[in-house]
Amino acid sequence: MKQTVYTASPESQQIHVWSLEADGKLTLVQVVDAPGQVQPMVVSPNKEYLYVGVRPEFRVLAYRITPDNGALTFAGEAALPGSPTHISTDHHGRFVFSASYNQGCVSVTPLQDGLPGETVTVVEGLEGCHSANISPDNRTLWVPALKQDRICLFTLSEDGFLSAQEPAEVTTVDGAGPRHMVFHPNQQYGYCVNELNSSVDVWELKDPNGNIECVQTLDMMPQDFTGVRWAADIHITPDGRHLYACDRTASIITVFSVSEDGSVLAVEGYQPTETQPRGFNLDHSGKYLIAAGQKSHHIAVYEIEGEQGLLHEKGRYAVGQGPMWVVVNAH
């Protein structure tokens, strides 16, 4: 399995393309000069395209991925209704979802042969909208509205329209600030990192009565931490055994173990990392974690070790200025 790491650096308007070797080393393949401040990225489900959100002209760019080395070739673009804070796709590669924090909206852009078209749906009134996360069954879009302490739930139709579910939302504790989400491989639980109180919520997607319920909230900060809480990103290993979340003030990655059924998290440790880690990601083997330091202008590669899933640094690499996003493609 070949793996490629992509990092987005908005301050220098660059995408760095790296080959991830089996021993965890990175080899630079390409540096792409992008037409704007590149931030969120996602790889298409068929692994053929990289979609990138850019500012200040709000667009989604599509780059075709070269199969042998992961290099990028510009393929197309489409306008977005708001500044893209987070982008994702449905599991079938038919739609791109864009969340806009500044405009407080989520949008749906159809894909035709991998290329984005004209936006078909925009839902507004989502203050601090920070991500759009499709459920494992490809039916429900979970959209955290950070400033409203709620996660809105929408049903995705076959033609890309969103309709409010019943219930239309779930709420966090006041001041939590729900931000990014991941789902357990068993499709029974979702995990949301809360930016403003640096906690992680465990959501049972459907209990026996059909309700969505928060079954655990866990503080992700060390007990002696007294600074401003500022959590950012969250990811889970492909086998569902280890979960990671980062905080930008403390510049740490918190390591969690996950119970076999996915319902319970436990803190296993804290890994110091690059300054102000805005984004990180995991490789597809579940062996490596790659973190970006927004203020260090470097990325670091960590090996995931042992039953606890603790992190051991393998190397660090200079990238563009202000790196904010990391994605990994297996091909």
From Swiss-Prot:
Domain of life of the organism encoding this protein: Bacteria
GO cellular component: cytosol
Record-linked Gene3D superfamilies: YVTN repeat-like/Quinoprotein amine dehydrogenase
Pathway terms, separated by semicolons: Carbohydrate degradation; pentose phosphate pathway; D-ribulose 5-phosphate from D-glucose 6-phosphate (oxidative stage): step 2/3
Primary gene name: pgl
Function of the molecule: Catalyzes the hydrolysis of 6-phosphogluconolactone to 6-phosphogluconate.
Residues passing through the membrane, by range: none
Any one GO biological process: pentose-phosphate shunt, oxidative branch
GO function term, MF aspect, one: 6-phosphogluconolactonase activity
Enzymatic reactions: 6-phospho-D-glucono-1,5-lactone + H2O = 6-phospho-D-gluconate + H(+)
Family label: Belongs to the cycloisomerase 2 family.
InterPro entries: 6-phosphogluconolactonase_YbhE, Cycloisomerase_2, Lactonase_7-beta_prop, N2O_reductase_N, WD40/YVTN_repeat-like_dom_sf
Protein's name according to its UniProt entry: 6-phosphogluconolactonase
